Amino acid sequence: MADNRRRRSLFDFLLFSVFLGLACLCLSPIPATAQRRKLRFSVNGEFKILQVADMHFANGAKTQCQNVLPSQRAHCSDLNTTIFMSRVIAAEKPDLIVFTGDNIFGFDVKDALKSINAAFAPAIASKIPWVAILGNHDQESTFTRQQVMNHIVKLPNTLSQVNPPEAAHYIDGFGNYNLQIHGAADSKLQNKSVLNLYFLDSGDYSSVPYMEGYDWIKTSQQFWFDRTSKRLKREYNAKPNPQEGIAPGLAYFHIPLPEFLSFDSKNATKGVRQEGTSAASTNSGFFTTLIARGDVKSVFVGHDHVNDFCGELKGLNLCYGGGFGYHAYGKAGWERRARVVVVDLNKKRKGKWGAVKSIKTWKRLDDKHLSVIDSQVLWNNSANKLVVR
């Protein structure tokens, strides 16, 4: 009984926090341009990213949980998702929060605007920069995909973009953009991007006749990615403090590439595969585009909630985030989870921070202790070729 009272108190506190945050949002809207900030590595030479995949948020306390234990059903709702997010943000203190689609479950949503605001409320309250891309369910309420992104980019503390201005006239989808992570303050690379993040809209469902299934990353998006990657390489190699090679990158989108089908329980490096991969219905060649450019070291997706593995194919890590939300389907007794990525810088001989040294990841479970599992190194610049001159 005491546990239930504590749980209800926490629910009430979070409901008040969400209400207060939304009230402030309505009374004091912050223009998106005013929120833009330069992201950079910390004085400790680290940049941490929290991935939240498949919240499937609907109507708050009135929304029932899916696939939980019988003992959890009576007191389980969207608020469990809210509580989990607040806990993991407090525990990890990330530098950036990334929502990789199906943020709301449109079919069950009564008020799209209210559900979107509530879904992101813990991130907004944390005042940590955050970004979002769309999945295949975000637009299934009263908002179109464009309307969803148009609203998201106006929320406080977000760095999300509808599309890059230079590509808005030709690019497919809504939510394609790049963020640059600059070197540590007071280092020679403080004004140079040493880590590049790519966010892409993988769409929802195929609109091509006789090609039913999930959507895919289009040629126009790949063209934008290729141009952006090449431009960032030129900037990385340029004076002042020119660097060799290309800065490493990470890519985030919702629907898995067909190449995720290459893995099973035997060759996935960490994590589990508990369901089939619901990949894009056609192979548009984006994996090949990523390999050809060479900067992206890891891809992170959602969509298949009870898969949370990473697998390496041709030097590129393909990783699931694992299902986060309680209104999303899951597996009873298999905890909801979030993926954390930490990128570390190389320390130079004089004690200053240099370019990226390694990329690591682990997952946090929504259990009593927020257990950490499946720690692994995704990429290590062992050759130390990215040197500060």
Curated annotation (Swiss-Prot):
Q: Which cofactor does it need?
A: Fe cation; Zn(2+)
The record lists the organism as Arabidopsis thaliana (Mouse-ear cress)
Binding-site residues for Fe cation, renumbered to this chain: 305
Q: In which tissues is it expressed?
A: Expressed in roots, stems, leaves, flowers and siliques.
The record's comment on cofactor binding reads: Binds 1 Fe cation per subunit. Binds 1 zinc ion per subunit.
Q: Which SUPFAM superfamilies match?
A: Metallo-dependent phosphatases (SSF56300)
Q: Return the similarity comment.
A: Belongs to the metallophosphoesterase superfamily. Purple acid phosphatase family.
Record-linked InterPro entries: Calcineurin-like_PHP_ApaH, Metallo-depent_PP-like, PAP14/16/28/29
Its cellular-component GO annotations read: extracellular region
Q: Which residues bind Zn(2+)?
A: 136, 303
* Gene name tied to this protein: PAP29
Name its cellular compartments: Secreted
Q: How does it assemble?
A: Homodimer.
Protein name as annotated = Probable inactive purple acid phosphatase 29
The main location is: secreted
The intrachain disulfides are: none
Keyword set, alphabetical order: Glycoprotein, Iron, Metal-binding, Secreted, Signal, Zinc
